[in-house]
Amino acid sequence: MTATPYPILLTPGPLTTSDRTRAAMLRDWGSWDTDFNAITARIRQQVLAIVHGDDTHECVPLQGSGTFSVEAAIGTLVPRDGHVLVPVNGAYCQRIAKICKTLGRRLSTIDYAEDRPMRAADIDRQLAADSTITHVAVVHCETGTGVLNPLDEIAQVVARHGRGLIVDAMSSFGAIDIDARTTPFDAVIAASGKCLEGVPGMGFVIARRTALERCEGNSHSLSLDLYDQWKYMERTTQWRFTPPTHVVAALDQALQQYVEEGGLPARGARYASNCQLLVDGMETLGLKPYLERKVQAPIIVTFHAPADPRYDFKTFYQAVKQRGYILYPGKLTEIETFRVGCIGHFGDAGIPGAVKAIGEVLAGMGVEIGMTVAA
């Protein structure tokens, strides 16, 4: 069992937060008050600093889940007659493609197996062959499996062709380096409840200022219009519509702790250590990771489910939960898996404790350890 009265979330967000972050939500804020506006301004500056984008980019926060911000970025930055190339190697890439279709943006895709990263050379060939493509939209860390895509290589290719790059960095931002000075992008999109260890409820788009300035009138939506949101914030320091005040206050506190910890290098190192402990521990149980280690992001790890017919995910999940850990089901199309997150605010005993609980549960179910689905 865990030492806390509530389960540890071993998920890619929402995730386990610190007492300080939760305590920040105990105060109520006026959404038009100058003190709250100062919090918003501070968050915008701190988020920009993480990517070294102060001189070239703008941080535009938005209410809602991260997907709201992804849709806002595509709907605002891609003109209505634009053409988006989406490399697809997982569920969240597929979501971007669905957004493009829903918004009526022309779409092309490059399809990969779910256990393989995107290849910059494929994108290079596609851009060379089709001059109508205006933007490329990629997922940095595909949360469906945990595969890490080669963002910098892709960014250099897209820039060389003079196209815009939109990056869904939901599961990587704040833990895996993205540097606006060396990795060209029009937008990087992330959210409060992931690697920054805030709570869910707001996202943000880090948009290249020169790209954003050209976007007036592009958006299909009033509430998801990033250009209007940005201009209004610049003019008034306020959100256009009622902000999630408690979520904003929690993110402000989470960012303070992020800096205290040592910023991106320290956060990334902690998650990498968690990932290593997790994979090593699960392999001792005979549970095989779905991905090769060289393409595994230290955010969430997908494991093959046991092939033993006595294994049932719902029973397994509930029993692990009773021991204090909440896992994630798989999000693959062909193979039965389950996922374990490496991110969140939990102590050094968190991952070893989870591995121990998983081993006990499988043994209690009579599942033959090591009898897993073949790759």
Curated annotation (Swiss-Prot):
Cofactor: pyridoxal 5'-phosphate
GO molecular function: 2-aminoethylphosphonate-pyruvate transaminase activity
GO biological process, one term: organic phosphonate catabolic process
Intrachain S-S bonds: none
Gene3D superfamilies, sorted: Aspartate Aminotransferase, domain 1, Type I PLP-dependent aspartate aminotransferase-like (Major domain)
Superkingdom of the organism of origin: Bacteria
EC number(s) stated in the UniProt entry for this protein: 2.6.1.37
Reaction catalysed by this enzyme: (2-aminoethyl)phosphonate + pyruvate = phosphonoacetaldehyde + L-alanine
Pfam families listed in its UniProt record: Aminotran_5
InterPro entries referenced in this protein's UniProt entry, alphabetically: Aminotrans_V_dom (IPR000192), NH2EtPonate_pyrv_transaminase (IPR012703), PyrdxlP-dep_Trfase (IPR015424), PyrdxlP-dep_Trfase_major (IPR015421), PyrdxlP-dep_Trfase_small (IPR015422), SP_NH2Trfase/AEP_transaminase (IPR024169)
Modified residues (N6-(pyridoxal phosphate)lysine): 194
Keywords: Aminotransferase, Pyridoxal phosphate, Pyruvate, Transferase
Record-stated family: Belongs to the class-V pyridoxal-phosphate-dependent aminotransferase family. PhnW subfamily.
Subunit and partners: Homodimer.
Role according to the record: Involved in phosphonate degradation.
Protein name: 2-aminoethylphosphonate--pyruvate transaminase 2
Origin species: Cupriavidus pinatubonensis (strain JMP 134 / LMG 1197) (Cupriavidus necator (strain JMP 134))
Gene: phnW2
